[in-house]
Amino acid sequence: MNRSKNIDSIIDILGENKAIDILKIDVKKLTSTVDFMIIASGTSTRHIRGLSEITIAEAKKNKLMSIGVEGQDGSDWILIDFGDFLVHLMLPKVREFYNIEKLWGFESVDINHSREL
């Protein structure tokens, strides 16, 4: 599976598992460390942990291995590193506070399922 399909597959998995405000950001021109970031919110720490576990398990089925995971133990922000793209899973209040979309030069937007910037 190519990178674009991997990213789309993860976005689909997040949507199917009730993640909210899913956003894909192209950061290739802003950093040399990753090409894309997927940002999504969950309704509780249990929900974002479940989202992270499902994302990692489904990625493995497609032979996509995560390099690392930060914040899985009861955190309100979990980061999954897939090498050339990252997945940020956060509680809405944490996402609003850190507003990493704006930090990377993008304005926050309200979306129903997914949106690409």
Predicted stretch roles:
Residues 80-82:
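Active-site beta-strand termini and strand-to-loop segments that position acidic
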Residues 39-41:
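Short hydrophobic/aromatic beta-strand micro-patches
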Residues 35-37:
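Catalytic metal-binding acidic patch
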Residues 1-33, 45-78, 92-93, 100, ...:
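Polybasic/polar functional segments that serve as interface/processing modules
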